[in-house]
Amino acid sequence: MKGFIVFSLSLCLVFTVCLAEDELMKEAVRKFLKCVACAEPGSELRTEYHKCSELKPERLKATMKACCDETMPAGSDEDARWALVCADDGILTKVCDCVKAKLPMAEVTTAEMEQFSKYKECAKKLNEEKCK
């Protein structure tokens, strides 16, 4: 169960894709997530990304978990789900659509956005250090 939660939390960068209006930004986020997804299970990259994921607002974590449950195969573990994203990052679009439906931007609070910004900074640093 812990591994599943880690995976669900890790995909929260999808929220950035959902918010991004700039196609270059969306592509950069997708490349980063693919980098994390294709990393070896238990790797330093995935471990560090999990630490970043812990910085996200609780409501977003819950929404992402629900969306991963809806869009990923039932019973798949964290590594299997990462493998799906590695093989086809199009799954991120499905998760993003689910997040937008369940948590419209109009309902995201200023405090949640501030908390999410901490996560984005952590993920950005990790991307620059490990995925470029």
From Swiss-Prot:
It comes from the Eukaryota. It comes from Hadronyche infensa. This is U10-hexatoxin-Hi1a. Keywords: Disulfide bond, Ion channel impairing toxin, Secreted, Signal, Toxin. It is found in: Secreted. Its main location: secreted. One of its GO terms (cellular component) is extracellular region. Contains 5 disulfide bonds. Residues 21-30 form a propeptide. Residues 1-20 form the signal peptide. Expressed by the venom gland. Probable ion channel inhibitor. GO terms for molecular function: ion channel regulator activity; toxin activity.
